[in-house]
Amino acid sequence: MKVAVIGAAGGIGQALALLLKNRLPAGSDLALYDIAPVTPGVAADLSHIPTPVSIKGYAGEDPTPALEGADVVLISAGVARKPGMDRADLFNVNAGIVKSLAEKIAVTCPTACVGIITNPVNTTVPIAAEVLKKAGVYDKRRLFGITTLDVIRSETFVAELKDKDPGDIRVPVIGGHSGVTILPLLSQVEGVEFTDEEIAALTTRIQNAGTEVVEAKAGGGSATLSMGQAACRFGLALVKALQGEENVIECAYVEGEGEHAPFFAQPVKLGKEGAEAILSYGELSDFERNALDSMLETLNGDIEIGVEFAK
């Protein structure tokens, strides 16, 4: 099993690479790529960690050597948020990066499962889809927007509020991956009751958690470490499913039936071909239904921007 981390010299990429070096199954190959010349050194550094995962780093303009033979590609390349920026501000730089990487993937590893971390995910995933379609290699089961950070934040914040073990909390998060498009289904958390005020406050905090970190870092970065953990959780789930483990379920932003939007985050059953089944997100509370209805214009607009960009 070969996993490629693209954007591996950045804050998310280095955290993700460290976690994968420690947690990938024995015998896995980990390839790191970044345009930055430090990348082979990041791989050398990580290679000293005594785990049965081989690691190699590649730098320069061409990601092809890292992508060759990859089963899973995790893309965190791009610029990070700074104070005053929202995810849409990132679009101008990151859209072009994702487009060119998708073009390389289409040629080099067209059957790989691709997980996109690069923001704005609502828009970068449709860009990648359009590029892969143009190349004639698109398989919607193999393209994911990684929204796991919204899930782990939800689990953490609920556990803190209710004094529970975060490992016991499961919160499905649907919609998209920015602002109002992030919808945690707090009505479905088992063994926990919330007041209306708690639901409103928690939902807002989860939606704005990225900004919370950007501001706390005072211009020194964005949510890199927690995102690395979230991407590792999703990447490992994908690896397990590809290797035949049953009942692997994670929320992800995928192309579905298009009931609400062409791409939508919801629980996905992962399997040997990627997304084996897109699962129902179940019954919504009135609060959640209203939040869903009011986000759809934003989400569909984000998707349309990506489709137009890739034309």
From Swiss-Prot:
Q: Where is the active site?
A: 177
Give the E.C. number(s): 1.1.1.37
Sorted alphabetically, the keyword list is: NAD, Oxidoreductase, Tricarboxylic acid cycle
Alphabetically, the GO molecular function entries are: L-malate dehydrogenase (NAD+) activity
What does the entry give for GO biological process?
Answer: malate metabolic process; tricarboxylic acid cycle
Q: Pfam families, from UniProt?
A: Ldh_1_C (PF02866), Ldh_1_N (PF00056)
InterPro entries, sorted: L-lactate/malate_DH (IPR001557), Lactate/malate_DH_C (IPR022383), Lactate/malate_DH_N (IPR001236), Lactate_DH/Glyco_Ohase_4_C (IPR015955), Malate_DH_AS (IPR001252), Malate_DH_type1 (IPR010097), Malate_DH_type1_bac (IPR023958), NAD(P)-bd_dom_sf (IPR036291)
* EC class name: oxidoreductase
Can you cite an annotated GO cellular component?
cytoplasm
UniProt-annotated binding residues for substrate: 81, 87, 119, 153
KW Transcription (keyword) present: no
Catalytically driven reaction(s): (S)-malate + NAD(+) = oxaloacetate + NADH + H(+)
Which positions are annotated as binding NAD(+)?
7-13, 34, 94, 117-119, 227
How is this protein organized at the quaternary level? Homodimer.
What is this protein for, i.e. what is its function?
Catalyzes the reversible oxidation of malate to oxaloacetate.
Query: What family does the database annotate?
Result: Belongs to the LDH/MDH superfamily. MDH type 1 family.
Name assigned to this protein: Malate dehydrogenase
The species is Vibrio atlanticus (strain LGP32) (Vibrio splendidus (strain Mel32))
Phylogenetic lineage: Bacteria, Pseudomonadati, Pseudomonadota, Gammaproteobacteria, Vibrionales
User: Which gene produces this protein?
Assistant: mdh
